[in-house]
């Protein structure tokens, strides 16, 4: 399977995100094509990560299947043959879309990242260690790095296609989407995370934190969209290696984050685009983490 930095399919391309290319199928459907692009600290790298697009698409498809009947979602199919049957123009491009395409329902997307944190890690730990707060809200004193947060903390952010997302308060979120919608988004976020965290733990994975996106479909329903509990949207830890009070090894893009942190501390990168080039060792280590995440979450090896 070749890597993909960008795509060119015989459908109108209506969007390009940090990782996904979005194509219009018709008035009701979209094709989401997950490339092997990778971003960290909201900056897209110049290199691709082998198998990454397929991992993200197929983990999301797994979770959408598990969530069937729990929350409504946008996925129609992530099976390549089913997609080609529904969109025959894609038949000559089977090799390009294999494993990485998802046929989805169109929605009007809410401009909010619904972040939920079950453990104190990453940027949340850095904020707490500095000011004793998370998303601007005071937390109890004495928490340690990677400590479990009970209950999990909902901390929304604005959604940026490029550049840096910005954490916002729940009060600000209510101003953006309205009180009723804000309540629904938080409730759905908590329900999805609770179910996902329980199922992942059975597979030996802790989902330390994750983020979701939602949209409103043509019938007015709020539905789950985009990706679900993947290595790009989540922090995965091994249950059997979890030790609060220290950083945890992650089954996600942590090798990339660690490398970029070194480059920033050394003054070789200022945190904005363009990013530094990635060594082959970082690319390989990151690809292995993605494939391991798929195996851990689904209990299967990825076969495309």
Swiss-Prot record:
Top EC class, one word: ligase
Keyword presence, ATP-binding: yes
Molecular function (Gene Ontology), one example: ATP binding
Keywords recorded for this protein, A-Z: ATP-binding, Ligase, Nucleotide-binding, Purine biosynthesis
Pathway the protein acts in: Purine metabolism; IMP biosynthesis via de novo pathway; 5-amino-1-(5-phospho-D-ribosyl)imidazole-4-carboxamide from 5-amino-1-(5-phospho-D-ribosyl)imidazole-4-carboxylate: step 1/2
Its EC number(s): 6.3.2.6
Database matches in PROSITE patterns: SAICAR_SYNTHETASE_1, SAICAR_SYNTHETASE_2
Signal peptide stretch: none
Biological processes annotated in GO: 'de novo' IMP biosynthetic process
Catalytic activity: 5-amino-1-(5-phospho-D-ribosyl)imidazole-4-carboxylate + L-aspartate + ATP = (2S)-2-[5-amino-1-(5-phospho-beta-D-ribosyl)imidazole-4-carboxamido]succinate + ADP + phosphate + 2 H(+)
Transferase recorded as keyword: no
Family: Belongs to the SAICAR synthetase family.
PANTHER family: PHOSPHORIBOSYLAMINOIMIDAZOLE-SUCCINOCARBOXAMIDE SYNTHASE
HAMAP family: SAICAR_synth (MF_00137)
Identification of the protein by name: Putative phosphoribosylaminoimidazole-succinocarboxamide synthase B
Species this chain originates from: Bradyrhizobium diazoefficiens (strain JCM 10833 / BCRC 13528 / IAM 13628 / NBRC 14792 / USDA 110)
Primary gene name: purC2
């Amino acid at each position: 399977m070749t890597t993909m930095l960008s795509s060119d399919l015989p459908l109108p391309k209506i969007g390009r995100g940090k990782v996904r290319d979005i194509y219009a199928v018709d008035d009701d459907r979209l094709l989401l094509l997950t490339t092997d692009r990778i971003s960290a600290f909201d900056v897209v790298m110049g290199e691709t990560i082998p198998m990454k697009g397929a991992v993200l698409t197929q983990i999301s498809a797994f979770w959408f299947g598990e969530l069937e009947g729990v929350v409504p979602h946008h996925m129609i199919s992530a099976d390549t043959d089913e997609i080609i049957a529904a969109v025959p123009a894609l038949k000559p491009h089977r090799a390009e879309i294999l494993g990485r395409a998802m046929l989805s329902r169109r929605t009007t997307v809410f401009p909010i990242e619904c972040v939920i944190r079950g453990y104190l890690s990453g940027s949340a730990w850095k904020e707490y260690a500095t000011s004793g707060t998370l998303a601007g809200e005071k937390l109890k004193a004495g928490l340690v790095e990677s400590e479990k947060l009970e209950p999990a903390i909902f901390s929304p952010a604005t959604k940026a296609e490029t550049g840096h997302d910005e954490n916002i308060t729940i009060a600000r979120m209510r101003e953006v989407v309205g009180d009723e919608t804000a309540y629904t988004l938080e409730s759905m976020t908590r329900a999805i995370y609770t179910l996902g965290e329980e199922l992942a733990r059975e597979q030996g994975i802790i989902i330390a934190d994750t983020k979701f996106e939602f949209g409103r479909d043509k019938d007015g329903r709020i539905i789950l969209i985009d990706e679900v509990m993947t290595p790009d949207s989540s922090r995965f830890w091994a249950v059997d290696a979890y030790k609060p009070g220290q950083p945890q090894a992650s089954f996600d893009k942590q090798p990339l984050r660690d490398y970029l942190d070194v480059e920033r501390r050394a003054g070789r990168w200022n945190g904005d685009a363009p990013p530094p080039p990635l060594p082959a060792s970082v690319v390989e280590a990151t690809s292995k983490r993605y494939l391991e995440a798929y195996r851990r979450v689904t209990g299967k090896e990825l076969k495309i």
